[in-house]
Each structure stands twice: as structure tokens, then as C-alpha cells.
Amino acid sequence: MAKYLIVGPSWVGDMVMAQSLFITLKQRDEEAIIDVIGPNWSSPILARMPEVRNSITLPTGHGEWGISTRRKLGHSLRSEHYDHAIVIPRSWKSALVPFFAKVTHRIGFTGEQRYILLNERRKLDKSILNQTVKRFTSLGLPNELAYPPMDIPLPALRVDSDNQKKLFQQHNLSNRPAIALMAGAEFGPSKQWPIAYFHELAKSAIEAGYQVWVLGGPKDQNDGEAIISHLGEFAVNLCGKTQLVDAIDLLAIAEKAVSNDSGLMHIAAAVGTEVHGIYGSTSELFTPPLTSNKTIHNLHLECSPCFKRTCPLEHTNCQNQLTPDMIIRTVLTQ
């Protein structure tokens, strides 16, 4: 029985995709114990992964060094006597906790002069490990099986039926089939399909007999209101009114989910919802929704993907030229 300490990623979608690594470890050793270090927001997601024993909160913000905090956490974990540590992020600071915890075997990709902190450093061959999920999963495999990993398991989050019932009552949701819209893009506006287009999609969905839920965080509230404006009782703006764990349960009920390339898109994929992923500045070849039940919407313009937070050409044609009719036609006819 091996005992693993995983240093998880900092983004919602990446943490969902990391479940493929956790499942891989369990497939290779069903008695394996897996604990995951992550940001505070990640605990509810990790609690829905049956492979994970404990989520360990790292009380530092994204981008903060927090060396003393990492040292203190590492020292507190020494009594766990972990056999292996897998450090998913490539930053120097990400490898500190396993080092201070005196984990015997510490593996991660080469980067930021981590020679002492890691005692197995893997080369990141981007031509072979050409997807995020491949990179994560490869770290849980022997070197000879890692380039690339084969038969990668798909994320599958647990759903809480009691919480689903509570959410329906709390938000007075309809019994109509639901389409979830996720219009936020935490990374930047270059990943965001226009809000006016989401409004047109919502209008058509309601006319076709659906209810529409707009999901997102507090920052998305105003956009959510714009999407449901004048659409009546079957359009509900839930942005900022639910927790991340609630989004898991709501998306599991929704018949379809239409989303920018975002963390919520990956959650929808991990609960089996039919996913319509909108791409432009990013690529579905690198971070696809990990499900067979998906449709990708991407114009594949010459300037795309740029992987920039804002459009360097100042037109965002990869989003603006993907018209509502193009999406509506596919979403409502499948």
C-alpha cells in the first residue's frame, strides 16, 4: 500500500482533470492512499472524488511564495510518512511542502531549478504530452509508460441527490429540462463568448421548452442578469448564489451545458452532462472536456489559438464571428 501526497493545480478545470491521475494511481494500487494539497476552494471538489482520502488546504493565495507557511505545513505532514509526492505545478515553490515533509520519493517536471526539492525530475516533452491531462497522468506512471500515457481514465465526480433536491427548492427551479450556461472566463476576456450571444441562446432555449440556468461566481452576476433579461420565469441567474459544490449537483441534472473554456465546463464533463465547449483563444486539442458526450465549437481562425488573456489583434473575432445561430442550431437539434 503506497501513500501519496499530491500537490494539486491552482485552477478549477485543472483540478478536475487531475482526477485522471488519482484514478490512475488507484488502478495501479487499489489500496493506495491519496491526499491532495490545494487552494481552499478545491476542498469541496476533492471531496467529490472517491479516490482522495484528504484534501489539505494551503493557506496562501495564487502566486504567493509563502515560504514559512509551506515550511510549517510540510513539517506538520512528516508524521504521515508519505511514500511518494507528485508535484503537478512546475513552480519552485510548489515543491517545497513535500520537501519539508521529508517525502521519500518526490516527482515532478523539470523547471525553476528544483534539483534539490525533487529527486525524480521528468522532462516535459510537449510534443508527446500535448494535453494537460496527459501531463498530469504521466507523473503517476513509470517512466517507460509515461510518454504518452495510454487509456487515460475520465474524471467522474460524485453527485449528492439530497443537495440537488435542496437546490431545486431553494431556487424555485422548474421541472423543465435544463440547459446550463457558463459565460464566465476567469482567465480573461479572450475566452469569453459575447454575453449578448448567450442571451440569444437562452431566449431560443426557453422558446424550445427548456429552462435556463446561468452558473458562475459573484464576478459573473451582472453578466448573468444581462443573459436572462426579459426572458421570464424559466431563466434563472444563479451566479454568486451557489457554491462550487452546488454547481456539481446542478450540472449533473442539466441536460446540456454550454460553456466557454472554463472550470465549470470541466465539471459538467465530469458529471456526464452533454457539453458544448466554446473555444477560440484556447484549443480543444490541449484542454478538451474529458467526455465522449461533447461538441466543440471553434472557428479555427488563422490567429487562433493565441492563448492570450486579451486579443492581441483587438478584435476577438474567434468569439465574435461565432454567431448565436451557429451554436443554437447545434445545441437545440442534438
Regions found by a protein language model. Give the residues of each.
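Catalytic machinery of carbohydrate-active enzymes
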Residues: 1-334
